């Protein structure tokens, strides 16, 4: 009987989303060498071992995290030599799933932008449209107001004060980041949140919940 908020990227529900982090790994893992020479990144990698593939993935991901949606599209066109993006619909909810979940009294549906951009890298108009469209689409489908929001990725590298102001303007009651800090009731549009991944162990989750991870980050700078 634990309540939960599920934050939804609406473009992924329409089977049009591109979770580039999955496609990037699928591309890298099947290559023994990768060379890039484009506007955004110029580098070569040997990718024969898992370790080498991981390094390459990390390098390219770091670059992609500094790009807008349109720039990411150009990057993948150069990387894969194809305009067609891979389909990962099986990994995500669809509209029927969201509508069914919304009926559960323990579940609250929140917005998470339309296409999961790096908001800080988008223009004001683009960021506003991304946040507003996800809210409006969910409200139209579910028949009620959407009051909660999660910033994509959510760190200070991806979210700016401008983005918080957009969320405020669109009348969200809460918004969560992936920052670690003491919650402030006067700052409900910049709430802290712990990020978890699929392979997270129970021990690692316990370390985050009891505050050890946050203590180490804030006081030991690691």
Question: At which residue positions do the language-model features occur?
Answer:
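Short beta-alpha junction loops
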Residues: 8-15, 180-181
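A generic structural signal for solvent-exposed, polar alpha-helical segments
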Residues: 13, 26-27, 31, 51, ...
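Conserved acidic, metal-coordinating active-site core of Asp-based
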Residues: 108-111
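Extended, charge-rich helix/loop segments that form flexible
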Residues: 17-104
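C-terminal active-site subregion of NodB/CE4 polysaccharide deacetylases
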Residues: 1-4, 19-20, 103-104, 114-117, ...
